[in-house]
Each structure stands twice: as structure tokens, then as C-alpha cells.
Amino acid sequence: MSSTENPDSVAAARELEALRAEASALRRQLAESPEQLREMESRVDSLSIRNTKLMDTLKEARQQLIALREEVDRLGQPPSGYGVLLGVHDDQTVDVFTSGRKMRLTCSPNVDAETLKLGQTVRLNEALTIVEAGNFERVGEISTLREVLDDGQRALVVGHADEERIVWLAEPLATVFEESERESVAYDAESPTRKLRPGDSLLVDTKAGYAFERIPKAEVEDLVLEEVPDVHYDDIGGLGRQIEQIRDAVELPFLHKDLFHEYELRPPKGVLLYGPPGCGKTLIAKAVANSLAKKIAEARGQDSKEAKSYFLNIKGPELLNKFVGETERHIRLIFQRAREKASEGTPVIVFFDEMDSIFRTRGSGVSSDVETTVVPQLLSEIDGVEGLENVIVIGASNREDMIDPAILRPGRLDVKIKIERPDAESAQDIFSKYLVETLPVHSDDLAEFGGDRTACIRVMIERVVDRMYAESEENRFLEVTYANGDKEVLYFKDFNSGAMIQNIVDRAKKYAIKSVLDTGAPGLRVQHLFDSIVDEFSENEDLPNTTNPDDWARISGKKGERIVYIRTLVTGKNASASRAIDTESNTGQYL
């Protein structure tokens, strides 16, 4: 430093330099402060997010602790008991059957004793207080109702081994329609709320002594078909006379009761339809039920679409049961069902198909004598103490000679109608039900009649019937030898039936479909029907019974002199040579 410099100026220069450095530092700090601020703000945001997550975690943990505490409390609760409500008292106490004991208990404040119903299931806590009302019991033993006692709250039922007991009726059973109410509502005999009748199956808790529910009889449901059949008289061909007979026997008494009463004429109790298989016996019975329902609906001023009648179609062979008395019990249940339906004023037809399988002549059984008790059961139902108002029995059989004579006498099955095999005129009528104008007809056949479809179908039917009923060599079926030595040639027309005619038409339709697939030419032809006739005849070659030709002939509708020998005479497409059928001395069972 120069000697001439002033010390004060030097100090001032240093101070100035220090101030400049401090100012520069302040400028740097001022420049860096926004970045620090942003960093601090970022840290604050991060801490806030962590704080929120920690709060959510704590809240979730608190909820889990509460749920676990509730689960621990629930698992630590003593078990609840159940009982059946027997009675409610004015002091809000109730009688309950629980654990094999009858106890008087109190209700929780959450349960209103006035809303409890007799027979209802209730839940009890550890202090034997009712804390909840449940439903009625759904499982138990099945017992048969013998009668409802005079108080209307109890019933006499029969359980296993004919053990009788008195039970209370739970509220669903105790609440029944009165006679006046049944007239004002649409009363259904199968409704769960209908009046109980002897023979009903009830769900019973024998320990609590309560009956809870009426159970439908499954065994009877399997044996009967309740419906208005969708079959009309117009659907049946070739049986005009027989249809008129059965209409006179069944419809007139229902539709004109006043005239029958005026002339003191008792309506028939039953009708027997007999004849060869496949000739329309079941169809007629169904058509009667349909027609009767519509006629009664019209007489009452109701819409025919609302027509109501009942057709109980009994599956005959299924009635037979290996256990003694079961068949008779089913017959009783069936007629009980018929009386229930008829009590509504609705006609009921009880139709026994294959009647000879159930009610054959007593003493004729080869390996069993079940008919000795089944036949009297039917007789007692038809003309027993309880009348069959609005109920008519229709039986069908192709072996009427095997039905017990007591069933066929007047006063039981009064009217007997034979369903004959169709003759040529009847066959044309039957063909017209299946060969209708809506079917496709081959153009060549239509061209023969100038495109007149009606004339073409009519002539087609005439040609087919002429082919079927011609006594020609190709139509010969059997040569039978009678016991007196006489011989007779039987033709296929002697064994024709409505079912066979339907089968022939179905075969022809199949031929027409195959023709379309092969040639592309659509339509039914007369030749298709001719081929179907040959096929049908050929398939029947082996049908004559080889064991007892006389029984087979009876079923087929050929009665008279006893047949001892049969020889087939089938010729034509795919037919085998004529052959003899040996008969055995020990005839055994037919078919």
C-alpha cells in the first residue's frame, strides 16, 4: 500500500466490498427462495396424502375390530331352540311345544303375540323367550284324514299301521271356506284352502300333535289325467252311428235333466265301448268329454272357450299292484276324486281303458285271484250307498267276453256300443280326415283333373279304398280252419282299422318327402298310397298269434266258430312265402 493512501479510505473500500458481497448473497438467496418454497409445498402435499391414508387405514382397522367383536359376540351366544306354537293367552304368554315338553313362555318385546298363528314355528333364546316367529313346518309324517271333529280345530287321522290319533289343525288347514263363501268365489276342489274331506293326505307332526298341510295324492295323480280333451266328433271318421248312440247315452241326461226327471227316466251309469283295437274307442270317449263340456257351457251362457269338464283317463294296467288291497284303495281314491269334481256341478267322465285287464271275470285268473276283490270294489263304487251324481263311467275293451258279467248288467254299464271295423264307406270317411286339401299334391295327379284339387283328393281316396277292399289275390291275408273243418279266406279288409289307415297315410307322406329329396318333384301321388298299403300289409304278416289263434281272432274282432288252424297267404312286395302256423294244445296266455 502506498504511504500516501488514507487509512480511512481503505477501510471504506473494504466495507464497500463487504456490502457488495452481502448484496450479492442476498440476491442469490432471493433467487433461490421460490424453489425452496415449491419444495416445501411439495413436502406438505406429500405429508397430507400420507396423513389421509393413515386415517383411512385407522378407520378400516376400527371397522374390522368392530366386526370381529360382533362375530366374537355372535359365536359366543348360546344356541337357540325351536318349538311349535300351541296357544296364545291374553296376558301375552304363549304355550309352546319344545324339546318334547309343553311349556308356557313369554315373548320378546320385538314379537307381537297377537300376530302369532297356531302351529307356527317359533325361535327361543337361552332364557326360553320367543324372539322370532317362523314359518309352518314343511316336513313330517303323512297321515290320512278320517274326519274333522265338530269344533273344526281338531281332526282324527290314521297313520302307519292304521294307528289313529287326534291332532290339531294348523291355521292354514283350520281356515276353510264356508258353504256361502264357496258359492261366491271360484271354488277349486284342488285348492289348498278347500274344505278338508275324508281320505285327504295330511302333513303331521305327531310329537307336537299338529297337522300343517294337505298333500296332493301323487299316486292318484299318476293314474288319472284331468283335462278337457282336444278331440271333436269331426275328428272321428266312419263312426256316425256309434257317436249318436253315445251322445244319446251321455249328453242327453246332462243337458236335459228336467225331461229325464219328468219322464222318471234314470240316466245310464256307464257305457261300454267294445270292438277291435285301433277303431276309435278312446277317441270317442275323449270327444264325448269335449262335446259335453261345450254343451253345458252354452246352456249356462258361458263362453265355449271356458268350457269345463273332467276326463279321468285311468291307466288300467297301472292300477294293478302286488300288495294286497292297494288296487282297491286306488279305485276308491279315483271315485272319491270324481265325486269331488262332480260336487261343483261339472260333469265327470271316468274312462277305464283296457277294462278287461282290471275287471276280468272272477275265478278266471291263471296265476292270481286279484279280480275277486277288485271287481266288487268297482261294483260298490258304481251302485253303492254314495251316489254318483254327474259322474258317468265309460269302459273300453277289445275282449268284452273277459269282463265280469256283474259289471255289464243293466244298472251298471247300461249302454254297450260295438265299435266295428270300418267298411269301404267308413274307410273313405276316415281317409278324408288325413288326406286333406291342404296337403301338397303331385302336379301330374292334379293335371289329370284339370288342377281341381278337391276332385283329385276325392278320387285318390276312392282308388285307395278300392285297392284296400278288393277281394283280390294280393289282398289275401289268412286262411283259417274252424273246429268243424270249414275253411275261410280272410282279406286285409277284414282287419282294417282307423289306426291302420292313419299309418298308411303317414307312410305315403314319408314316400312323398323322399321323392322330393330324390327328384325335386313335390307332392303326394296315388302310387305313394298304393306302396304304403303293400308295406302295411306285409308288416302284418307275422301278427297272427302262434299260440292261441282263437283268442287272437277274438281280439281282432272275428268271433263265432272256434279257430284251430291259421295259414298266412300274404303275397306282394317283400312278402315271404305262404306258411302255416302251428297251434299248441296248451294255449297259455293270448298275445
Swiss-Prot record:
Domain notes: Consists of three main regions, an N-terminal coiled-coil domain that binds to protein Pup and functions as a docking station, an interdomain involved in ARC hexamerization, and a C-terminal ATPase domain of the AAA type.
Chain residues that bind ATP: G278, C279, G280, K281, T282, L283
Family annotation (Gene3D superfamilies): 1.10.8.60, 1.20.5.170, Nucleic acid-binding proteins, P-loop containing nucleotide triphosphate hydrolases
A cellular component term, taken from the record's GO annotations: proteasome complex
Gene name for this UniProt entry: arc
The protein's name in its UniProt record: Proteasome-associated ATPase
Source organism of this protein record: Rhodococcus opacus (strain B4)
Stated family: Belongs to the AAA ATPase family.
Single annotated GO MF: ATP hydrolysis activity
